[in-house]
Structure formats: structure tokens, C-alpha cells
Amino acid sequence: MPITPFHIIAGFAVKSIFNKHFSWSIFALTNIIIDVEVIYYIFTIGEASHKFFHTLIGSSIIAFSCAIIGIPICERALKFWNNNLQNEKSLAKLKWLSTESDISVVSSFTGAFVGAYSHILLDSFMHFDVKPFEPFFSKTFVGIISIDSLHLSLVGLFIFGLIVYLFRKFR
């Protein structure tokens, strides 16, 4: 499934621990951009195909690009998000969802590269055609962990991240 939410929610645990040093919005952007290739193949050949962007070389190029280009894009999106939460028509109960809109270069690169490498690692457990180390060798990790166990682990990471986030936000 392209742009699976499981990739993105797993990053929430990293964000909750490394708050200022990790951009979750850049992490999410990187995950989405990596799957643009899969969406392209769905529309052109009629099936999901994981190719160049799902290798270390391809995902590194995407991560570097997202780390640079993503800062102004994500900062603008976060400012829009925060402004809408501060809107007088917004429910006061939702204002706690506002977040820091400034993204440092360090947090951008951390979010982008953790996003890219975790994406191809997770996909290599689920899809036979993901070979992260190509063109050097064609190793896949399918079967090491069941997809159900993988999904449960990612949901568990999200719940852990949510607990840490809420604890830090309201202490």
C-alpha cells in the first residue's frame, strides 16, 4: 500500500524522544515522496513496483532533497496548521495540538534520513521487490517478521510516542 500510515506514525515515537532534533513533518514528507515512484508504477503498469527510490542510493537522494526543499514547505504548512488552531472559531481544546513551526537544518536532515531509511527497511520486510542494497546485491528481508507483527510493532511505537508526547506536553 503506497504511503502507508504505518511508516508515518512510527516516526511519532522518534519525534517524542528527540523533539528538537527531529522534524516529524520532514519525516512524513520524505516517506510520501519515496512512494511517489510506487504510485507512478500503479498508474503506468497497473501494479505497485518498488524500484530506485526504495534503495539506499535512491532514498538517500530523496532524503537529501527533502531535507533542503522541505524546510520552507513544512514550515509554511506548520504555520498554517498553528494559525488555524489559534483561530477564534477553533475549539479551545484543540490548541494543545499546535507545534513549533521553525525547523532547524539538523532536525530536517535527521527527519529526512530517518524517514528514508526506515521506509525502505520497513518496506523490505513487506515487499519482495524491495532490495535496499541494489545494485550491490539483491537481498530482501521478506519473511523475517510477519506483516501483522510488523504493523502491531509500529502501532505500539505510535502509542509509546503518544504517551511520551502527552507527558512532555502536559507536565
What are these regions (language model features)?
Residues 1-171:
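N-terminal membrane-targeting hydrophobic helices
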